[in-house]
Amino acid sequence: MEHGTLLAQPGLWTRDTSWALLYFLCYILPQTAPQVLRIGGIFETVENEPVNVEELAFKFAVTSINRNRTLMPNTTLTYDIQRINLFDSFEASRRACDQLALGVAALFGPSHSSSVSAVQSICNALEVPHIQTRWKHPSVDNKDLFYINLYPDYAAISRAILDLVLYYNWKTVTVVYEDSTGLIRLQELIKAPSRYNIKIKIRQLPSGNKDAKPLLKEMKKGKEFYVIFDCSHETAAEILKQILFMGMMTEYYHYFFTTLDLFALDLELYRYSGVNMTGFRLLNIDNPHVSSIIEKWSMERLQAPPRPETGLLDGMMTTEAALMYDAVYMVAIASHRASQLTVSSLQCHRHKPWRLGPRFMNLIKEARWDGLTGHITFNKTNGLRKDFDLDIISLKEEGTEKAAGEVSKHLYKVWKKIGIWNSNSGLNMTDSNKDKSSNITDSLANRTLIVTTILEEPYVMYRKSDKPLYGNDRFEGYCLDLLKELSNILGFIYDVKLVPDGKYGAQNDKGEWNGMVKELIDHRADLAVAPLTITYVREKVIDFSKPFMTLGISILYRKPNGTNPGVFSFLNPLSPDIWMYVLLACLGVSCVLFVIARFTPYEWYNPHPCNPDSDVVENNFTLLNSFWFGVGALMQQGSELMPKALSTRIVGGIWWFFTLIIISSYTANLAAFLTVERMESPIDSADDLAKQTKIEYGAVRDGSTMTFFKKSKISTYEKMWAFMSSRQQTALVRNSDEGIQRVLTTDYALLMESTSIEYVTQRNCNLTQIGGLIDSKGYGVGTPIGSPYRDKITIAILQLQEEGKLHMMKEKWWRGNGCPEEDNKEASALGVENIGGIFIVLAAGLVLSVFVAIGEFIYKSRKNNDIEQAFCFFYGLQCKQTHPTNSTSGTTLSTDLECGKLIREERGIRKQSSVHTV
């Protein structure tokens, strides 16, 4: 009203009033009136999607900025949107020129690399900022300065993937790419084999055809368990369906997807398969502000008309939408810092750049902001994003984290953040393997596992029942009890299946495996619970738990028939060699004693003490007397010959000590040899087997025992394997039962595990274990290599061991009736068959003594008769020559008397010479 009165009064409009009004219109009004800043967007469309998600995010960001005046209080952001067909770079260039002519402060899009290059070239020529949010292959000679790209650098993502591969210690990796740009994005990983011990196999998805089943079939056949997929999220959704169809969605596979939209896919169908699925996430959903924006976006999308099926969760914000949202905000931040930003109309054909373009471009590159995709900063030189974080997420069954908003709750429920990769500091895993195993029942509870096993008493046997049995009830044994205990601890359900070929698992000359090991390698079974030996060659292709039983290889052989001691069994306590050595020792000691007794002067004595001047001395230790002394000492009897000299006493004392030990040892062993029936076995050890060929021996075909001898470098075992391999048709048996029957019925020795031998000998008294253990090893639960169940099974086995349940189970299944009849043979009365030889020796000695006495009598009689005749004849001749007679009666008498005297004198001389020996 006041302004109306003032104007109505004439004469009050003056020159000063005019200048004031002009000042207000030129200076005050522009500063207080809201400015308008126009930005342009070029977006590609497809037939079934007229409006893509980037355009929606572009509009969503502009609307959010205009509603919230805190960022641009005096500026209103407007936009101009142009839509082009996919891959149409010419149309993209034309639409870009149209927008530049209209006057825009920055230009967003398009997405495809060829269109991006065309628009970027125009923006660089006219010095207008070009904002990019998609990965673009950088040109080597690119000198464009007027662009920024919010998408993480391809080299950085490739390094992140390589760091993750090294962290998981993957030795073989399969890279599956969708198009040729995938090989460019994964350059750091592809070059890894030259620097790290990693084998990389590269495969390409079929182009145009979405059927990847043939490719997946090859991967399954090649046992390629660690796979990196470089593809879009649409392709990833389709690939996952086919992976499930091929039966490759199991806990043995680990899939990594390079798409940053993996978290946005609907993976509810795969959560409980046990598969390992890992990816990167750029959205910073841990930030409550980010979560609230995502919720708003989701609400708007759910209210919009339904979109074509893309595999994404309904209303989920993708990474490309978040990047576009952040890109608009980065331009808004830069424009807020710029004062008096005037946008000019530019013509492509004039090549006249925007005057404020370089300054505005620098403001954008210098801008910093914590957006939906984390902290955003740019490299001022190349315009690429730097110092960004990638969340490492892993698919899980159930979550415990809490988040605001339904979308965030779902993300936390399906995905678990296990680490962060920063472009500067690298990998930082926050969820270690130890944390994952804190509760050992987490991943096994209510999961059904396929268990492969083999019939082997007492580990796995058919249950005897009058009623038909089905499923796991068909079997019983130690391994079934072990499975039941493991199931009670870990909470899993199991389905027991016998191995089709009935073998444990061995490798042929071509490197192919069979038996239970092959079942695990081919992932037809999750566990192998059987008497499966932990060996080096098996450990290279499958994993083992800690052993639940320790054992070794030994020899199973039938008990030899008992032989009663013979009549000369009293000789058995000492070997024939010892008997010979004792006899030689007795003869040697006798000779030494004879020589020393002759040599020492203290063994000579005067036989006539009353005549000290006698020159006649005697020595008791003649050769026969020395031998008699030795025999008497050996038989522990006296010989009435006592050595007098110190030297001869030393010989006698040492001989007595020798005989003491020999007789004591003989006496100690005599009772056992005479009273116990001896079991004489032709073999006592593996060396005895190797030294002979009469007794055939072998092992179970394709078992760990056979593998042990096949791989052994010890000469004895190499010789044994040469014997077995030369007779494979007869030496090697199909299973233990066949081998046991051969041991019982033929001359055959079976090499097998000591625990099995212990079980068999408890129930068959005709069999026994020969020798000790050849080696030491253990039985373990087998799992496919890389199985997540191995550590959990190991912990459960250690728990059973500490509780003593493993020992109780073995006692239950190994305890048998025994062989008590063995005890009755330990003591028995001696009969003639035991010691009859002693009587034979006695009788032989008596008979021998009689014959020796007769021989001595005859020998002495003949010797005396010869001496008397010789002397009578000799002295008769002497008498006739000395005393010739004249008369027959006188001379003859004298001669006879002289002859008799001479004969008597000669006999006296001979007798004296026989007593006094010098």
Swiss-Prot record:
Keywords: Cell membrane, Disulfide bond, Glycoprotein, Ion channel, Ion transport, Ligand-gated ion channel, Membrane, Phosphoprotein, Postsynaptic cell membrane, Receptor, Signal, Synapse, Transmembrane, Transmembrane helix, Transport
Effect of residue 636 to R: In RNA edited version
Annotated L-glutamate binding sites: 531, 533, 538, 704-705, 753
Secretion signal, residue range per the UniProt entry: 1-30
SUPFAM superfamilies membership: Periplasmic binding protein-like I, Periplasmic binding protein-like II
Cellular location(s): Cell membrane; Postsynaptic cell membrane
CDD domains, per database record: PBP1_iGluR_Kainate
Catalyzed reactions: Ca(2+)(in) = Ca(2+)(out)
Chain positions with Phosphothreonine modification: 761
Modified residues (Phosphoserine): 725
Membrane-spanning segments: 577-597, 654-674, 835-855
A GO CC term assigned to this protein in UniProt: kainate selective glutamate receptor complex
Pfam families xref list: ANF_receptor, Lig_chan, Lig_chan-Glu_bd
Protein's membrane topology: Multi-pass membrane protein
Function: Ionotropic glutamate receptor that functions as a cation-permeable ligand-gated ion channel, gated by L-glutamate and the glutamatergic agonist kainic acid. L-glutamate acts as an excitatory neurotransmitter at many synapses in the central nervous system. Binding of the excitatory neurotransmitter L-glutamate induces a conformation change, leading to the opening of the cation channel, and thereby converts the chemical signal to an electrical impulse. The receptor then desensitizes rapidly and enters a transient inactive state, characterized by the presence of bound agonist.
Oligomeric form and interacting partners: Homotetramer or heterotetramer of pore-forming glutamate receptor subunits. Tetramers may be formed by the dimerization of dimers. Can form functional heteromeric receptors with GRIK5. Can form functional heteromeric receptors with GRIK4. Interacts with KLHL17.
Name of the protein in its database record: Glutamate receptor ionotropic, kainate 1
Natural source organism: Homo sapiens (Human)
Gene name per UniProt: GRIK1
